[in-house]
Amino acid sequence: MSYLVIAFLFILGTLLGSFLNVVILRYHTGMGLGGRSMCMSCGKKLHAHELIPLFSYLIQRGKCRSCKSSLSIQYPIIEALSGFVVLILALTLSPILGYSMAVFITLFVYALFAFSLLLVISVYDIRHKVIPNALSLAFALISFFSIFISISGPVVPSVLELFSGVFLALPFALLSLGSKERLMGFGDVKLIFGIGYLLGLSSGIMAVLLAFWIGTVVALVLLLFRKFGFNLKTEVPFAPFLSLGTFIVFVTNISVASYIALFV
C-alpha cells in the first residue's frame, strides 16, 4: 500500500471522525444531523475553513474564532482516532485485495460501519454513562448480518454462529440482573451481544477478557494517582474497553482457542 493511499485513508478517516463528532454531540439533543455546524457556546455558524479536521483545531489553538471559548479536546481526538481506525482496518483487510476488490470494499465498508458505531457508543458512554438502546441495537443488527458474509460470498452460518451473541452475552446478563446492574450495566450486556456476532464466540470471549484486563489496569492507574476525582465508588464506562478489546481482536485475529493452543 503506497504512502499516497495511506495518507488518503487517514484523511478519509479524519473526515469520518468529524461527522461522528456531530453524531455524538447532537444525539438525543433534539438537533438533527443536517444543517451547518456551529460553536456549541455562542451558536455561531462555522465556515468551511473552520471545519478542517485536526488543522482547524490546531490553527485556532482550540478556541472558537468568534467567542474565544475553549473547544472540546474531543474534536481532534476523535478525528485522529477515526483516521487511524480507517487506516488500520484497510491494512488488516488489504490481503483480500489479491482475491477481489469488490469483496474488499464490501468487508471494509461493513467493518467501518461497525467500528464507527462502537466509537460513537464509547464516547457517548464516557460523556453520559449510558449506552443508547438505538445504537446498541444498530450495532447488534450489523454484527448479526456479518455471520452471513465471507470472503467467498454469502454463507449459511452454523448453529454456534447463529447463537454466538446469545452464548457470549448470557453469563453477563445473569451477572447484571443478579447484581441489579451494580457489577455491570445492561447496556454493556447488549453491546457484548453484538460483539459475539461480529467476532464469533471464541474471539468474542477474548475481546471481553481484554476489555476487563485493560479496564482493570486503567482503573488501578486512575485510582493510584487519583486522577479526575476517581475513587472506588466512581462509575467506570465499560463500552470504551469493550470496543478497544473488539478492535484489537478484529485486527489481530486472536481468540481464546488460539491463545490456549500456545500452551498445549
Regions found by a protein language model. Give the residues of each.
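Residue-level signature of transmembrane alpha-helical entry/exit and packing/kink sites
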Residues: S2-F10, Y75, E79, V103, ...
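Alpha-helical transmembrane segments
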Residues: L4-V22, L174-L183, V189, F193-V264
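Membrane-proximal soluble regions of multi-pass membrane proteins
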Residues: L20-Q74, F238
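Hydrophobic alpha-helical transmembrane segments
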Residues: N21-G32, E50-L58, T106-F115, S158-V159, ...
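Structural signature of transmembrane alpha-helix termini at the membrane-water interface
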Residues: V23, Y27, F84-P95, I105, ...
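Interhelical loop and helix-boundary elements at the membrane-water interface
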Residues: M31, G35, K63-Y75, V123-L137, ...
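Short microdomains enriched in Cys/His and/or Lys/Arg
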Residues: L58-L97, V103
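Functional transmembrane core segments of multi-pass inner-membrane proteins
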Residues: G98-A102, F113-V217, S258-V264
